């Protein structure tokens, strides 16, 4: 969202919203199922779906145990996919309603794809939307800002982000504890600070 960084040590950090990530609003629904299937996380790239403003179209499904009532377990099936690009000049509205259009898109995807979907369709138990960030190259950024190593990044959703977030958190914890992790594809790069002076 909107932040201010006072930098007394290193190059100025560009705080524009889209410097390292592009903002989108992602829409998800969740359904309670019997706990008779294992946990899963799957991405789908339907061939018959129009390309979105973000340049890709995919749906994602996660299934995991969930305890709604005490000592009564269900599978929580979460499905997302529809997105709307968030221009830099526009603020994300947390309280805006869940669009019927996106609910219909998710329901159509579930009816066509999810084998456990009942014949009369699945009724959503939960609906929500949230701000998501995508890096320009599709690869998560984890580690110190090259021009100002006091700023640590763990940026980029780029699909199902649960496991990469955990991995990123572990790398950040190593940096904070004084250990320098081995170089990886996730290291932030900024050629301004890598050129010889």
Regions found by a protein language model. Give the residues of each.
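Central helical "cap/lid" subdomain
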Residues: 1-40
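Short, solvent-exposed loop/turn segments at the edges of secondary structure
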Residues: 22-24, 54-56, 72, 137
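Short, solvent-exposed loop/turn segments that connect beta-strands within catalytic domains
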Residues: 37, 66-74
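Short loop/turn segments at secondary-structure transitions that flank enzyme active sites
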Residues: 3, 35, 67, 85, ...
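Short beta-strand micro-motifs enriched in acidic
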Residues: 62-66, 144-145
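Short Gly/Pro-enriched turn/cap motifs at secondary-structure boundaries
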Residues: 17-23, 42-53, 123, 129-133
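C-terminal catalytic lobe of FAD-dependent flavoproteins
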Residues: 72-75, 81-197
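Extended catalytic-interface subdomain
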Residues: 1, 7-8, 28-29, 42-64, ...
